[in-house]
């Protein structure tokens, strides 16, 4: 202990005479008188008592003796009720005494000024954070963000190679592949294509209806795109593949009997292959084309834009295509090509899912040519919209 005291000298002596006197006598140390001109003594000057304080000074002691178990707050309530119950004549002596004390206080302390004590504020639980600390932590977080985004993009690229797609997680990567032009280079899109918009925005800019369709991914891509290494993909709703006769002029029509499509379930859009590139072999599936469908071009109703279709039906539709591909088309042709056969309509429904329009709405040759021209123009517009 002595070595510690020697190593750390104290500016003041450790001896405290007041503490020694208290310990020796067992009594409180005597109060040290202060000079009247001292500022500390003026700050401790008490206010003169009013009439209630003069009366309650003795009355509180009497109630405390009578009710020793009562709290001081309860005693104050009782004193307040008793003071209000007193009459003016009973309060008169206490009012006079308070006036005398006030005059005496003015003589003793002519320069007295009332300084109310500040209430002790509770210590704040949360302290102010240093702005430098916030800036440093923010910079560290921003430096870590590109690494996380690049790592997550690499994982998404592996999922794309394996054919695994999630509508929620694959959207940023697919958006980067779609919006990037052919000059983006081979392979997948770079992270810059995804991070071009600020992350403070709730939604990325340049949103279009095609962006909503991109998580479902295209199932039929042109081989020339893979050969040239262009990452651009043409999004469309998943559905059955089509034969080359219908690929240049895909049509989607609406009929009073329901929505009719060529070789697929109602409500699914169609797409033509990219010009200048040979279409994928999946377009030549024999199970989805039949000569009876050639009549549909002559009987078209009001055209409507292709509606959205949920992506989770794509696998079911592909499995149905594979099952139909295993069947022999000649078995259907010998029944469906027979004129006047009662099962021809039933066979058409089993193959395409709807009744042939030729049995419902016969039309003339002039109307047929006009509707065909309008249908081709509308199909060309929709194809250009989906490609762009």
Swiss-Prot record:
What is the annotated tissue distribution of the protein whose record heads this document?
Widely expressed in adult and fetal tissues. Present both in mesenchymal and epithelial cells in some adult tissues, including colon. Tends to be down-regulated in prostate adenocarcinomas and colorectal tumors due to promoter hypermethylation.
Q: Which residues form the Sox C-terminal domain?
A: 268-388
Q: List membrane-spanning regions.
A: none
What domain of life does the UniProt record list for this protein's source?
Answer: Eukaryota
Residue ranges with Basic and acidic residues bias: 36-45, 146-164
Q: What are the DNA-binding region positions? A: 45-113
Q: What InterPro entries is this protein classified in? A: HMG_box_dom, HMG_box_dom_sf, Sox7/17/18_central, Sox_C, SRY-related_HMG-box_TF-like
UniProt GO cellular component terms = chromatin; cytoplasm; nucleoplasm; nucleus
Q: Where in the cell is it found?
A: Nucleus; Cytoplasm
Q: Extract the SMART domains matched here.
A: HMG
- PROSITE patterns to which the protein is assigned, alphabetical: HMG_BOX_2, SOX_C
| Gene Ontology BP annotations | cell differentiation; endoderm formation; negative regulation of DNA-templated transcription; positive regulation of transcription by RNA polymerase II
One GO MF term on file is:
DNA-binding transcription factor activity
UniProtKB keywords: Activator, Cytoplasm, DNA-binding, Nucleus, Transcription, Transcription regulation
Q: Where is this region: Disordered?
A: 20-46, 140-197
Does the record carry Hydrolase as a key word? no
Question: Function, please?
Answer: Binds to and activates the CDH5 promoter, hence plays a role in the transcriptional regulation of genes expressed in the hemogenic endothelium and blocks further differentiation into blood precursors. May be required for the survival of both hematopoietic and endothelial precursors during specification. Competes with GATA4 for binding and activation of the FGF3 promoter. Represses Wnt/beta-catenin-stimulated transcription, probably by targeting CTNNB1 to proteasomal degradation. Binds the DNA sequence 5'-AACAAT-3'.
What PANTHER family does UniProt report for this protein, alphabetically?
SOX TRANSCRIPTION FACTOR, TRANSCRIPTION FACTOR SOX-7
Q: How does it assemble?
A: Interacts with CTNNB1/beta-catenin; this interaction may lead to the proteasomal degradation of active CTNNB1 and thus inhibition of Wnt/beta-catenin-stimulated transcription.
The name under which this protein is listed is Transcription factor SOX-7
Q: Which organism is it from?
A: Homo sapiens (Human)
